[in-house]
Amino acid sequence: NQVRIYVWEGLSDMLAAHPERWPLGVGPDALYLGYYPYFVPALRQIDNPLVGAHDRSHNEPLDRLATTGVLGLIAWLAAVEVLFFYAARWLGLADDRARRNSLIAFLVAGPLVGALVPLAVDRSLRFAGLGIGIGVTLALIAWLAWQGLRRPAPTAADRVPADRAAVITALLGVLAAHFVEIQVGIPVTATQVMFWALAGVMVSVGVGRLDADEAAPAVEAAPTQAAAPASKERGAKPL
């Protein structure tokens, strides 16, 4: 809505006025102080007139760029996209070099195109953050659709176990939904903890740490080995 556009406009003006802060930003949770001189006065007509500034812009990529700079934005995007990349690998969708390289290309090109197109059209950064989020989301959807259309049906040897695939797919959907949400919303502490906790669960399932099928034989083997000496004693002849 108009409130978000005005906030993004103020952040765009702040970034344009201080190019020396682009590498590292104004500092985590310091957006309120840096944004105050660039507050758009028209925002008071549609928002609380007592509000003099905002500490969040309702767009996580733009927040990251303003508070942690280009380096922080790249690090955050890399962390999120690595989760998407490995989820695709664990689902068996990127099991060879060609598919992995194509997925990397999509995930790199998506945010770049998403940032450059609004910058070229609007001549400012106010929609660049939204474009980055849309670019990542569309890149992931396009790659998954492309693989679904061109990939042959998996053989029994290549098929991922159904229970593991279901859990990873569900967790990937939750993580992607949260990523979409923070393009126009504010990531509060609860949602951030949820995101990284579920990311940890997905990694554990993906690498097999939570695979009950692999742990069961090890548990059942111990009683069998312990029972062997007892069976020998029962079969021994008395002296």
Predicted stretch roles:
Residues 48-93, 165, 169, 181, ...:
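Polyanion-binding and phosphate-handling cores
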Residues 82-134, 151, 206-221:
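Internal, charge-rich low-complexity segments
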Residues 133-146, 195-217:
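Hydrophobic cores of alpha-helical transmembrane segments in multi-pass inner/ER membrane proteins
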Residues 1-66:
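Interfacial juxtamembrane loops and adjacent helix segments
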Residues 218-230:
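Intrinsically disordered or compositionally simple regulatory linkers and C-terminal tails
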Residues 70-107, 137-166:
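Hydrophobic transmembrane alpha-helices and their immediate junctions
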Residues 233-239:
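Internal/C-terminal transmembrane anchor helices
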Residues 61-68, 100-133, 169-196:
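Membrane helix-loop boundary segments at the extracytoplasmic
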